[in-house]
Amino acid sequence: PQNTLAAKFSLPFALATTLVNRNSGVQSFTWEQVRNSKVQELASRVEVVEDPELTAMMPDFRPARVVIRLKDGRKLDGETRTNRGDSEDPYSKKDLRHTFLSLCSRVYPQVYCEQLHDQLMKVDQLEDIRPLMESLRNQCR
């Protein structure tokens, strides 16, 4: 990929950076990782192939199959019908908090992000959203 946005939509890059970094979080999609020669080399060996049987399952499912061929000739494979985070496999509250904090803390102080997360998780219980919006506005100044 030519930039971080393209990296986020590149299956070869996403697979390669996840394998190299053992993580698919926001840190795996930075400029540093886009330029990482190990990630680039591995991504160049990824082949994306449509499987009509899997495509036919859409839109009810979002299936995928991954096959990894090792240098010693062994083959590792796995298949899923859903993406993590779908209604079939929802994120836990702990996972949502971790993801929110990892993204928010790139822009705002960690303490503020923790407070904001807690407020957002109860937004449906607020009688008045104006204090929350004012807090966000103040952080943007």
Predicted feature residues:
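Terminal-appendage/accessory-domain detector
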Residues: P1-R141
